[in-house]
């Protein structure tokens, strides 16, 4: 059995991000200069596949107005892992954070993007 450190998983995720794995409606704003942009939902799902835990959703606010949602993971003992937090500019503030149950089966949104990211990460970790 191959053992992977969190740093291995993080590197596999980061090197797998692309415009094709980000939220489709924001694909036009994705750039290699900010590769974490709009990758949070699919990244949180893949990390959940690999490490378990809970999915957490917060709100992104600009000038006090919600503009989007942000997703990350909570592992055992309340340890939170957010591999895409750096996507935000200084005017964007993530507030709150509620645990959201993972939907069973295929995702209602982002299924293709999630599957592509999951498969790329699995290949990089030698599980593909």
Language model region names:
Residues 1-128:
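A structural boundary/capping signal
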């Amino acid at each position: 059995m191959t053992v992977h450190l969190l740093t291995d998983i993080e590197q596999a995720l980061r090197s797998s991000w692309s415009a094709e794995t980000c939220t489709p409606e924001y694909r036009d704003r994705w750039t290699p200069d900010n590769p974490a942009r709009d990758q949070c939902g699919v990244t949180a799902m893949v990390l959940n596949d690999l490490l378990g835990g809970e999915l957490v959703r917060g709100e992104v606010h600009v000038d006090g107005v919600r503009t989007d949602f942000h997703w990350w993971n909570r592992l055992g003992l309340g340890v939170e892992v957010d591999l895409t937090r750096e996507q935000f500019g200084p005017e964007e503030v993530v507030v709150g954070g509620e645990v959201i149950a993972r939907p069973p089966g295929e995702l209602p949104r982002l299924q293709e993007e999630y599957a592509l990211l999951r498969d790329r990460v699995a290949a990089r970790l030698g599980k593909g």
